[in-house]
Amino acid sequence: VREHSIEVLLPFLQVCAGDAPLHVVPVCVGTGQAPVLRTAGQRLARVLERCRSRDGQRPLLLVSSDMNHYEDQRTTLRKDDLALDAALKGDADALLATVAREGISMCGAAPLALAFYALHAWSPDAAVRATLVMHETSAAVSHDTGHVVGYAGLRIFSC
């Protein structure tokens, strides 16, 4: 597996933590199969609960992903919107189905689905939702609208 998101995220996490201890458990996801991810999410929820019970603080789940890759601006925004619609509802099954059906090259769809499954298992009576912080494409910087990558920031919570 050539996963590199932890290498990208770790420096940001270290800056945010400052002098406080930082405990990180990277999880690499190698499948997009919903049944496997659902089971892994249930197991991850048990780990998260044990982490919380030790110090009283809730652990943070952080998922890194680009959105659609290397299509034109219009196509990328359309595909991103389809994936984001499912993500904003906290619906792992819909996210995975949409990405597969629409041919969306979102590299972190499976890790995001895993996080949704884990949150649903961790708090079964709570609704899992997300809010969009920002959505943009690489064209905002490169001005090349022919081949863009989509980026989105989501804040995900259970309530």
Predicted ranges, named:
Residues M67:
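Active-site metal-binding loops of divalent metal-dependent hydrolases
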Residues L61-V63:
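Residue-level marker for buried hydrophobic side chains located in beta-strands
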Residues V1-P59, Y70-C159:
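Flexible, D/E/H-enriched segments
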